A protein has these predicted regions:
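Positively charged n-region of N-terminal signal peptides that target proteins for export
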Residues: 1-5
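Bacterial N-terminal signal peptides
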Residues: 6-17
Length: 494
């Protein structure tokens, strides 16, 4: 329903007489004149995009970081143009005020074009140009549409093309949010570490291929979850470097037509200052204008993280299964009734939604790959899809991880009696007897245990294979886990 409301409102804004008190201004482009709502900050090209692409209802302002990124790119471009003498300082001052207003969260409701669009992102670039130009006009006492004073093309798009601003804005959007994503992953790691410390010496059975294997501790299991996520954090750091090179100054195809000398370097320099990231000009502008390596690499890192989160979530779902006819090794916080027909049922909704998000991220990564390889010749026209896929993946993982941590992981408890029962009745500890009585005799013991339903320890005592002292020394559950407590001790900060 939301989709159709968004589309309908966007289109209604363009229909004369749709609202009784609505007034309009007239703007024109190469296709002719068009009425634009007088209070709209966008212009004629945005209006055409609203008519041409009422597709998903997911507008570019759905992700505020993307709108903020456009303001940063346009500000850096204006600053660079001023540095090289192409723009007057007075005009820069006006454009800077407009860009800073958008960076501060204002006027985002004017960034209305749909993410799904043809034209390699031209609709989005012009939406940004027109809105920022009209904000600048108002700030200097002019009316919207008086482009002889501040022009969307000549001023906001000076020394630029959609083909360099669009990929750069997407990269900036990713960079602005990557630190937050990493910070949240670090919090999730800390939560798993805390659970690992709390249950460090609680022994349980490890399983391979869903069958009992050898003993481990609950703490080891949770610390392993944390270690796995730490590897993904490093991958996010590593992937970020592929977002640093930008093709600002490439303009249409990478040859830099209409670009003043020194502009690419100055633009990257200003982008670095505005973002706090080491952004640099791409070494080959022609390649950078069609090459999607940055999107592919960062999307791959997000996919890898999603795979890890999904695996951990699936483990939690298994470990909490039951409560009477499943593993029931851990308890997850009960969040909501789980069934409209089965009384008392509570489902593991947080791990499940993490699975769902992970599946979406994996699908998005596939879309990024398809978009990346399908661009023809000197430009990739499918960057809007790649950009949306990655920015959505980034946001989904970030927000879901907050919920997963606070509503699930932080509240996990362990059913120690269940684990004790499993350890008493398991056949898994028979592996520890291999060095003592050999593999064949150990196998015979395991077979007897399965047939009789007895535990290994019970059979060992019946057959007097080991003395009680030997059992204590050789089959101590904690010793069998190989637990190295020093591995998990917090190191004092230097």
């Amino acid at each position: 329903m939301t989709r159709y409301v968004c589309i309908s409102l966007a289109v209604l804004l363009l229909i004369p007489g749709a609202f009784a008190q609505q007034s309009f201004r007239v703007e024109k482009d190469l296709l002719g004149e068009k009425q634009i709502p007088a209070n709209a900050y966008y212009g004629v090209q945005t209006a055409r995009a609203l008519e041409n692409f009422p597709i998903s209802g997911v507008l570019i302002n759905h992700y505020p970081g993307f709108v903020e990124a456009w303001a940063i790119v346009k500000l850096a471009a204006a600053q660079a143009n001023t540095d090289v003498g192409a723009m007057k300082p007075e005009k820069l001052a006006t454009i800077e005020k407009a860009c800073q207003a958008v960076r501060g969260g204002k006027y985002h409701d004017q960034f209305l074009v749909d993410w799904y669009q043809g034209g390699a992102g031209t609709s989005t670039n012009m939406n940004a140009n027109e809105v920022l130009a009209n904000i600048a006009l108002e700030l200097t006492g002019h009316k919207k549409g008086e482009y002889q004073f501040v022009d969307p093309h000549d001023d906001l798009n000076m020394s630029q093309s959609t083909n360099d601003t669009y990929p750069t804005a997407i990269k900036v959007a990713f960079l602005l949010r990557n630190d937050k994503l990493i910070e949240e992953m670090q919090k999730l790691v800390a939560s798993f570490r805390a659970k690992g410390d709390a249950y460090l010496e609680i022994v349980k059975m490890g399983r391979t291929e869903m069958q009992d294997a050898v003993p481990m501790t609950v703490g080891q299991e949770f610390h392993a979850f944390a270690a796995g996520l730490e590897a993904e954090i490093q991958l996010l750091h590593d992937a970020e470097k592929y977002l640093y090179p930008v093709n600002m100054g490439a303009t249409a195809i990478g040859t830099g037509i209409n670009v003043p000398k020194g502009y690419p370097e100055k633009c990257a320099e200003h982008l670095a200052k505005l973002t706090g990231k080491p952004i640099v000009p791409a070494s080959d502008m022609l390649a950078a204008t069609w090459d999607q390596q940055g999107f592919v690499a960062y999307s791959a890192a997000l996919k890898s993280l999603a795979v890890k989160l999904s695996k951990i979530s699936s483990d939690l779902i298994l470990l909490t299964s039951g409560p009477r006819a499943g593993l029931f090794e851990i308890n997850l916080p009960p969040l909501q009734p789980g069934s409209s027909i089965m009384p008392g049922k509570v489902n593991p909704v947080m791990p499940e939604v993490m699975n769902i998000v992970a599946f979406r991220v994996m699908g998005n990564d596939q879309s990024v790959g398809l978009a990346a390889h399908h661009g023809q010749l000197q430009l990739n026209a499918y960057e809007p899809l790649a950009g949306l896929a990655v920015i959505e993946s980034q946001a989904l993982i970030y927000y879901t991880s907050i919920l997963f941590r606070t509503k699930c992981v932080d509240g996990i408890t362990v059913n120690e009696k269940t684990l004790e029962h499993y350890m008493e009745t398991t056949v898994g500890i028979v592996t520890a007897l291999n060095p003592i009585i050999g593999y064949e005799k150990s196998t015979e013991l395991a077979g007897e245990a399965y047939k009789s339903g007895k535990g290994i320890l019970e059979i060992i005592r019946e057959k007097k294979i080991l003395t009680e002292q030997q059992i204590k020394e050789l089959l101590d559950p904690v010793k069998l886990t190989g637990l190295d407590r020093s591995k998990y001790e917090k190191k004092p900060q230097q």
